[in-house]
Each structure stands twice: as structure tokens, then as C-alpha cells.
Amino acid sequence: MPSTIRLHRVLRATPEWVYRAFLDPDAMVKWLPPNGFTGKVHHMDAHVGGSYKMSFKNFTMGKSHAFGGEYVELVPHERIRYTDKFEDPNLPGAMKVTIIFKKVSCGTDVSITQEGVPDVIPAEACYLGWQESLILLAKLVEAEILV
């Protein structure tokens, strides 16, 4: 049975910055690929009904996998919902991802739900990948660059 992954983080950044990091192609390749992977955005049309395609490449092995989907809901600085599907036929099914951004006293509370993760991907591996990605997201949006 497909897995559902739920993650929660509080980031020291505004909802505007965190939301933008999920929709900006340059930001996505900086933070979304987990440790050991590089990323490439092939296209990103971030509007409801628009689509995206991205790939991760294992840096040491050179193997890559592509995935993409469609934006279902975009509420600026509050919520993103999209579908996500791997191109590899061995990773079947469409996933549904919901990200909720909530302004809190010290930044942004981010909740992520990823439903329908294919059975062949261990849930713990998915959690690990997301955790690594969220550390990179924090480094991007929490940076205090004065120039």
C-alpha cells in the first residue's frame, strides 16, 4: 500500500520567502535534491493547471530520475498543492503533495504531506530525503545576507 509522509518544520524566515523557495526554479535546485544528488528543473510553469518537470542525479553514480506533475492549488504564502509522478515505470502512481505555510512569531511553520508514495520506496528513505532537503531549505531561506 502506498505510503503517506508527513513532515513539519519551523523556519526562521517569512512565509513569503519560504513559499517562493518552493516555486523558484533556481531555489529548487539549490535545496530540494537531498544529500548526494544534484537537481535540474526542465520546466516550471507555477500557476494552477501549470506543470513542472525536474530531475535528480546521483552525483557519484551518475544515475538520474525524472519526475513532474501539475499545480492543483497555489495560495500565495499559505498553501501549495501539486501532483507528483516519476517517469520510471517501476515507480508507479501519482502522488499528491500539500505544503501549508503558517506565519508564527519566529518565522514560518511549514507542514508537508506527501500521499501515495510508491510501495517500492521505503517510507523511512523518503523521510530521510525530505529531512535532508529541509535542512538545505533552512540554509537558503534563513540566511542573513546584508549585501
Residues covered by each model-derived region:
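Hydrophobic ligand-binding cavity/cleft-lining segments
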Residues: 1-38
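Intrinsic-disorder/low-complexity, polar/charged segments enriched in Ser/Thr/Lys/Arg/Asp/Glu/Gln
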Residues: 2-8, 15, 39, 51, ...
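Short, surface-exposed charged micro-motifs
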Residues: 8, 43, 70, 98-100
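A generic beta-sheet turn/junction motif
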Residues: 11, 75, 103-105
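Hydrophobic pocket/interface hotspot
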Residues: 18, 28, 52, 71, ...
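Glycine-rich portal/gate segments that line the openings of hydrophobic small-molecule binding cavities
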Residues: 40-83
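Beta-strand/loop substructures that line and gate deep hydrophobic ligand-binding cavities in soluble
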Residues: 81-131
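Short, highly charged C-terminal tails/helix-capping segments
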Residues: 140-147
